Every structure is written in C-alpha cells, then in structure tokens.
C-alpha cells in the first residue's frame, strides 16, 4: 500500500512531457491537457500496472528530481589560492574528481588550474545516475589508427533539469603526444593539416555492440573557449522535420594547446532527450590514406577460388520442391561503381552475391564520404569484412577480351560474347561452310526440279550474316494499272462510241446534214497544222481539273477542236482517263486529246442550263487523224461539223 502511495506521489510530480512518455510506454493515449494526462496515469496506476510500468515511473521520477551527492556548502571554496583547502578537497582527493563530479580513471589537473569560471561551476555537479566510464566501445574507423585515449567514453550528464544542458571536460597531453602531433604537421597546402590528430567522438550510451558516431541534438562544442566547427546540416527529407547533422568524428587538433603544462578544456552543450543518453570520448589517432588501406587489404591475401566455386554450385543446385531451376549465372567483369573493368575484385563476407566491385574505387569513395555500403546489394560492407575473390582474379587474367561471363552448374565459367562478335567469329569459317551450303543448296534445287518442276524449294543459309536481314529491302516496283498502261489498249468501259449519227441519248433534236460542198479543203488543211509541244508532266497526268471549273456550260469552237484532235500523233498516250478537258486555248489540255484506241467521250449534258449538247465520236477523230480531210467523205465532214455544234463540260 505504501508502495502504491509512493508511486502515486511520483506520478503527481511528473510534468507533461514525462506523463506523455509514461502513457506512451504503457500503450495509452498520450494526447490532452496536463490534468487529462494525469487522470489517465492515475487510472493506469489504480488499475494495477505491470512491474515494467512501475520501473518506468521510478525512472522518470529520478530524472525529474536527481539526488545531490554534494551540496554547495560542501564544495564552497572561498579563495582557492589564499586560504587552505577544505578537507573535502584535499590534494589526495582532487585527482579522482572530474568536472561532472564523478571519479575518473586517469588523473586530472587540480581544480585551481581551471580558473575561477569553472570553480564557480563546481557546485552544480550531477549525481551518479549514469556511469562515468561505462563499458562503451565505439566502432573502429578504417582510416584512423588509434594511438591513445585522452578521455575514455564518458556519459554526458548534468544536474541542470532544463532541456538545454552543458558539461565540461579536461585533458592534458604528454611530451610524447605533443611531439607526435607536432612532427606530423603538413603545411604544403593552404591549410595546416596533421596526420596525427586529436579526435572527438560522440555516441549513444549503449553497451550491446560497438557504437557508431551519433551526435546529441543541438550539439555545440567549445575547445579552449573557441567554438569548434561541426559537419553541416543535412537537408530535411520532409517538411517540418528538424534538420540533423551527419555524425562524424570531429578533428579538434587545430584548437588544442600543444603544451604539457597547460590543460585543454572541452565544453559540450546539447539538448536532453527523454529515454536517450549520450557519451563522448577523445582519442589520439593517426590518419591513413586509401593507398595504405589497399595495401593492407592485399596483405590479407586472396581468398581461395574454391570458396567461390562452392558458392556457385550451391546457388545452381536444383531445388526439388521448386518448379523453376537456375541453370547458369551471368556476372559482369565491370565495376558497378566506375563502370570500368575490375582490377582488384572484392566483396564483403556478408554479401551473398557473386558480383564483385573494384576495391580501389570502393576505398577511395569511402575516403571522401564514409558510408561503407555494398554497391551491389546496398548492405553494410565494412572494410574489415572485405575479401579479394581469387576466382575472379583468375577470370580477369585469362579473359581479357570479354566483359561478361557465365557460370555453369559445375562451377566452370565461359565468356559471354555479343551477337556481333559471335557472327564475326563464325564468318571466318564461311569459306568452308559456304561451299558446303552452296553445294547442298544446288543438289536440293536440282533434285526438286527433276522431281517436281512446278514446286519451288527455298533453301535458307544460316551462315549468312544476320545483319543483311536488317537491311532495308528495296521497295517493289509499282504496278501499272492495265487501263493506263501505254502498251495496252484503252478500255471502253464507261465510254459510249457512236457512229455517224445523232446520239440516241442526246437531248438535242436531230439536225439535217450540212452540205460541205461549199467548204474549201485547203481551209481544213490549215487546221491540221501539227502542234509540236512537250508532253504533259507525269505528276499532272492523273489530276482532275474539273472541280476547279465553274458549273456553267462552256461552248467552244468545234471545228478548231476537231482539227486539233486530228493533228496529234498516235504515239502520245497522255490521256489516261476518259474525261474531256474543255480547254481550247491551252496547249497542255490539247495534248490530252491525243488518246488512241477506239475510246469515245461520254455523253454529257448541262445539269443546270437547258442548252443543247451532243457527243463527239472517237471514230470520226480517228478517221480524221489517220487519213486526212481530202479523203474524207462529205458525210464524215458533216458528222463532225454539222451534227456536233458544241461541247459541254461533264460537271
């Protein structure tokens, strides 16, 4: 009962943030005002909470009200330099006290050397809620060799109950350490660099495994009252998310006093997080280059090729329960990082794939930005787990003209060549294979011709370069319409051929024959003057010009038209259609009238007007062209000039 009352009193003294942590830990709703959160926490306690929740309440209460191990009266120092030191701060006890009030494993400088500022800060020391030197180990950095520990991993702790906290540390250098740092100075560049460095690192206070570098939130570091530059903030991935710094070791060598008599102080300020504690450590390290790491990797030796062959056989072993079996594996000899041929093929022991990457490029990239992630499977591939594959070293030695290989079930390998390379190799043997294939083709063709002449057998030569199939074939010759072929006679389809009489479909009344005795034959001969004109262009021969003409009936001089049609030679085949171009003044359209054969113009009449129309018989045109006006009969002349008074458009 007393225990529950004590827990209730602890819950009543918690703040909003601590109540939210408690309710969230218990799986309850943690939203609301303080009195609502307090009511929920009391109901949780009244309902009988688990021992884990009770421990959480006590932990939150201890953080809320830390117990003091020293009081200001105990650590009052009226004048360190003039008055005797109190018994509690005797010289024998000072070396075991650090600035956060915890015993230290390494002796530190007396308090009088810290100055009056830190003497006034001594009363505000924290309690022993966290171990000063917990069993914390930080991950080993491949590019740094550890020379010494200046400050062992120590928890960041402060008696300040506020969110922003601050604590101070101090360390001193030995003469040997000062000499190591001074002798490693490199002033060749614009900056003064040191290969032996003083390195500050932060991590989480966890002992389960070696810890990675992890900065506390809102970290600020001052070394000897000078601000220390930290890595820049990373851009947030989402809106409203607080930006964070990339956690890396901090080089504070340029801010350290290289002296054996003057100590170095480090003031760390950060923002406290509920449920998380941090630790810091200071090391003396030596920086290494990628060349040194590559030499060390080679010194480890090359892995036996049989290990890789066993892995290949394991991957290609058929699973009896699976319907799909892998029969081969294709692996590239190009590095996935630089897309260049591998020189030192390596991969991590933790990787399950066979694909390797180049060790030189991998180490150089991590020297600029240490991530140590496998470029093939995106898993962690630390330097300590890298191995050089002996099987790939053999492949690179014997396969110099190929960038891809294929592993088989027995662990053997074969180069994978492109189609063009394979075709070039097979083309060199076409001298023998071509003769055999041509002989075989000839024998098959002769045998089929003797047995069945009507049946053709197509023999395909597989040794011919396939690139010829990809070439564009010449388009087949365009077929000429039989009705428009120059050698074929013009079709009479859709054309009405009439003798020397009036058309039965003509709407004009029959006219009596005109006496042509009074017409002088020399006059007609004048109209037979040949027109020497160039033929009509081919691209204009099939065009229909009637839509561009007006729909009214157009009358032309029939005598001139008939004479022009009779004068055109028979070898001009420019009129490919049965339409009549109603132009008399243009030489282009007069050429269209030179169509040969027995075709006739279709009978037409005006659609809108009531004018009379008639047809021109091609027979009369043929007679007038083939023989002459002098040999014509009077009836022929009358049929041309008397019966057909005018010609109208089809449209």
UniProtKB/Swiss-Prot annotation:
Residues 124-288 form the PINIT domain. A motif (LXXLL motif) lies at residues 19-23. The modification Phosphothreonine is found at residue 487. There is a cross-link at residues 40, 46, 137, 238, 453, 493 (Glycyl lysine isopeptide (Lys-Gly) (interchain with G-Cter in SUMO2)). Its EC number is 2.3.2.27. Belongs to the PIAS family. This is E3 SUMO-protein ligase PIAS1. The gene is Pias1.
């Amino acid at each position: 009962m007393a225990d529950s009352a004590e827990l209730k009193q602890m819950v009543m003294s918690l703040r909003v943030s601590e109540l939210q942590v408690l309710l969230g830990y218990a799986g309850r709703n943690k939203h609301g005002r303080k009195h609502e959160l307090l009511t929920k926490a009391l109901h949780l306690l009244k309902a009988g909470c688990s021992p884990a929740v009770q421990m959480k309440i006590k932990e939150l209460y201890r953080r809320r009200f830390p117990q003091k191990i020293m009081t200001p009266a105990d650590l009052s120092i009226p004048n360190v330099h003039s008055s005797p030191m109190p018994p509690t701060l005797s010289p024998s006890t000072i070396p075991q006290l650090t600035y956060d009030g915890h015993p230290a494993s390494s002796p530190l400088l007396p308090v009088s050397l810290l100055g009056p500022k830190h003497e006034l800060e001594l009363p505000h020391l924290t309690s022993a809620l966290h171990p000063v030197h917990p069993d914390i180990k930080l991950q080993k950095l491949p590019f740094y060799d550890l020379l010494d520990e200046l400050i062992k991993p120590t928890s960041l702790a402060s008696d300040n109950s506020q969110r922003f906290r601050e604590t101070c540390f101090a360390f001193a250098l030995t003469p040997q350490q000062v000499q190591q740092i001074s002798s490693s100075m490199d002033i060749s560049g614009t900056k003064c660099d040191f290969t032996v460095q003083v390195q500050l690192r932060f991590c989480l206070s966890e002992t389960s495994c070696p810890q990675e570098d992890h900065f506390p939130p809102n970290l600020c570091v001052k070394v000897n009252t000078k601000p220390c530059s930290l890595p820049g903030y990373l851009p947030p991935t989402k809106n409203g998310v607080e930006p964070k710094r990339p956690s890396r070791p901090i080089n504070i060598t340029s801010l350290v006093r290289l002296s054996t008599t003057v100590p170095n102080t480090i003031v760390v300020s950060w923002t406290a997080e509920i449920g998380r504690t941090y630790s810091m450590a200071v090391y003396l390290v030596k920086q290494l280059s990628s060349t040194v790491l590559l030499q060390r990797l080679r010194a480890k030796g090359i892995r036996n090729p049989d290990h890789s062959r066993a892995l290949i056989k394991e991957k290609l072993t058929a699973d009896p329960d699976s319907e799909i079996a892998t029969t081969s594996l294709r692996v590239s000899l190009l590095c996935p990082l630089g897309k260049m041929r591998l020189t030192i093929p390596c991969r991590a022991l933790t990787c399950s794939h066979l694909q390797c990457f180049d060790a030189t490029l991998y180490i150089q990239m991590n020297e600029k930005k240490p991530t140590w992630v496998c470029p093939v499977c995106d898993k962690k591939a630390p330097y300590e787990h890298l191995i050089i594959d002996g099987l790939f070293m053999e492949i690179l030695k014997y396969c110099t003209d190929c960038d891809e290989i294929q592993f088989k079930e027995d662990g053997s390998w074969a180069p994978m060549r492109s189609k063009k390379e394979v075709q070039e190799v097979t083309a060199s043997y076409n001298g023998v294979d071509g003769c055999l294939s041509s002989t075989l083709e000839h024998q098959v063709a002769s045998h089929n011709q003797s047995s069945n002449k009507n049946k053709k057998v197509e023999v395909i030569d597989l040794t011919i370069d396939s690139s010829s199939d990809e070439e564009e074939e010449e388009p087949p010759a365009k077929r000429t319409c039989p009705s428009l072929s120059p050698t074929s006679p013009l079709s009479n389809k859709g054309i009405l051929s009439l003798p020397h009489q009036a058309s039965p479909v003509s709407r004009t009344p029959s006219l009596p024959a005109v006496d042509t005795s009074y017409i002088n034959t020399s006059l007609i001969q004048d109209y037979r003057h040949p027109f020497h004109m160039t033929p009509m262009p081919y691209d204009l021969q099939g065009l229909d010009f009637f839509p561009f003409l007006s729909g009214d009936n157009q009358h032309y001089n029939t005598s001139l038209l008939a004479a022009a049609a009779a004068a055109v030679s028979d070898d001009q085949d420019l009129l490919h259609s049965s339409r009549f171009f109603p132009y008399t003044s243009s030489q282009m359209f007069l050429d269209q009238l030179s169509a040969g054969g027995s075709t006739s113009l279709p009978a037409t009449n005006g659609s809108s007007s009531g004018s009379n129309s008639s047809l021109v018989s091609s027979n009369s045109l043929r007679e007038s062209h083939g023989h002459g006006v002098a040999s014509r009969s009077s009836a022929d002349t009358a049929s041309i000039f008397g019966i057909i008074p005018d010609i109208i458009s089809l449209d």
